[in-house]
């Protein structure tokens, strides 16, 4: 390539969903990629995640639409119940009318299956090298290249660096230096086999029960053979961001006042994973010469909009498009990528905080929430979602 005479790879710090999305987008632009992953193997942890139409637009743009579609479960609706009295607050059909409106379905899927689809796609290109047990420590750049020094003292040289190394991003720490914002909200996640899941709750829906300072989510996974269970509460103790083993006693202690139908979800999992959540204040710059940030490294968000993985994949697609229109000029492309993503991802971060407040409303605020959403037509819900689900590769770049 004209701007890469030494045929250097593009370096990607992080082999999660965002890093792999970036790798696929870069390969589609003709680059080879070296992924530096600090874990001993390329993999993913977690449970289920929700995928809006924007995620499927991203899958298609990255060339893995068929793989991802084959692993997803397609819901009939999104349903919200009040966790105190069990009443229906609202429902949003996600069938044919939804698909026609947004051009793609709404689905639920195991996070591991999203990662696997991306990983298979990257491996099949033959253009992505993976280095595991490799943690970026320091980055240097000059006019034509970037060098990443790892914990073993090795130097990795590339034409550019994508920092997709998560909430605790080393790349962000060097170039931005801000602190993560620990929310005090704790998420417990588990997967339950269908045979152990109550028949009365085996709905083909993304279901949420909203309560004071808490909520519960469940939906089917893997052809309906498993169910994802996610519960969130406001912790009584100081928290630090991270993932640990969950405690049945702890999670049960936070859901004493909810209705029996929702309460039974707490007793189902044999084991839980516990996430103390964090986000960051939105920033206006995350591109620095030949270095840029992507996914949680750029705009970590809480889970209330169900858009963390979706935003990372959108980032990858947008990055590829920015390179295309800038003839693979990385500094210029990174500027356009940043300009195209800052406002949208900031809106996700801030909207997610507000959605958490609405979900966890109590007292009179709870009554107002329920009245606002009861009886709302699907069309009104769809109109409110247009800014989110209307994203696609054709409109992803900022206009001059």
From Swiss-Prot:
pH dependence remark? Optimum pH is 8.4.
Q: Give the organism's phylogenetic lineage.
A: Bacteria, Pseudomonadati, Pseudomonadota, Betaproteobacteria, Burkholderiales
MF terms (GO), sorted A to Z:
3-hydroxybenzoate 6-monooxygenase activity; FAD binding
- Keyword Oxidoreductase listed? The answer is yes
What this protein needs as a cofactor is: FAD
Which family does the UniProt entry place this protein in? Belongs to the 3-hydroxybenzoate 6-hydroxylase family.
Arranged from A to Z, the UniProt key words for this protein are:
Aromatic hydrocarbons catabolism, FAD, Flavoprotein, Monooxygenase, NAD, NADP, Oxidoreductase
Q: What's the protein called, per UniProt?
A: 3-hydroxybenzoate 6-hydroxylase
Q: Which reaction does it catalyse?
A: 3-hydroxybenzoate + NADH + O2 + H(+) = 2,5-dihydroxybenzoate + NAD(+) + H2O
Q: How does activity depend on temperature?
A: Optimum temperature is 30 degrees Celsius.
Q: Which organism is it from?
A: Polaromonas naphthalenivorans (strain CJ2)
């Amino acid at each position: 390539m004209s701007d890469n005479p030494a045929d250097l790879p593009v370096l990607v710090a992080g082999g999660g969903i965002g890093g792999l999305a970036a790798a696929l987008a870069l390969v589609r632009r003709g680059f080879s990629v070296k992924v530096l992953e600090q874990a001993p193997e390329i993999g993913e942890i977690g449970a289920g995640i929700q995928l809006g139409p924007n995620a499927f637009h991203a899958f298609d743009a990255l060339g893995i639409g068929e793989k991802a579609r084959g692993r997803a479960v397609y819901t009939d609706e999104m349903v919200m119940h009040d966790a105190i009295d069990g009443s229906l607050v609202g429902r949003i059909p996600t069938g044919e009318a939804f698909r026609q409106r947004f051009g793609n379905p709404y689905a639920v899927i195991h996070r591991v299956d999203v990662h696997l689809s991306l990983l298979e796609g990257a491996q099949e290109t033959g253009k992505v090298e993976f280095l595991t047990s490799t943690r970026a420590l320091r980055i240097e750049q000059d006019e034509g290249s970037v060098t990443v020094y790892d914990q073993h003292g090795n130097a990795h040289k590339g034409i550019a660096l994508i920092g997709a190394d998560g909430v605790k991003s080393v790349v962000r720490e060097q170039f931005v230096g801000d602190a993560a914002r620990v929310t005090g909200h704790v998420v417990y996640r588990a997967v339950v086999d269908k045979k152990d899941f109550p028949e009365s709750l085996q709905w083909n829906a993304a279901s949420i029960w909203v309560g004071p300072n808490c909520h519960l989510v469940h939906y089917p996974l893997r052809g309906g053979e498993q169910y994802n269970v996610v519960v969130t509460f406001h912790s009584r103790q100081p928290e630090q961001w991270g993932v640990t083993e969950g405690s049945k006693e702890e999670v049960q202690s936070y859901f004493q006042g909810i209705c029996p139908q929702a309460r039974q979800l707490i007793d189902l999992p044999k084991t839980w994973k516990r996430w103390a959540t964090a986000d960051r204040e939105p920033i206006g710059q995350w591109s620095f010469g030949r270095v840029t940030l992507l996914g949680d490294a750029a705009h970590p968000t809480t889970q209330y909009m169900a858009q963390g993985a979706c935003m990372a994949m959108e980032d990858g697609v947008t990055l590829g498009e920015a390179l295309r229109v800038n003839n693979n000029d990385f500094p210029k492309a990174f500027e356009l990528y940043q300009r195209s993503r800052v406002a949208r991802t900031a809106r996700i971060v801030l909207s997610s905080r507000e959605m958490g407040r609405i979900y966890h409303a109590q007292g009179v605020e709870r009554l107002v929430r329920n009245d606002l959403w009861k009886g709302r037509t699907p069309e009104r819900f769809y109109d409110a979602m247009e800014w989110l689900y209307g994203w696609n590769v054709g409109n992803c770049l900022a206009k001059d």
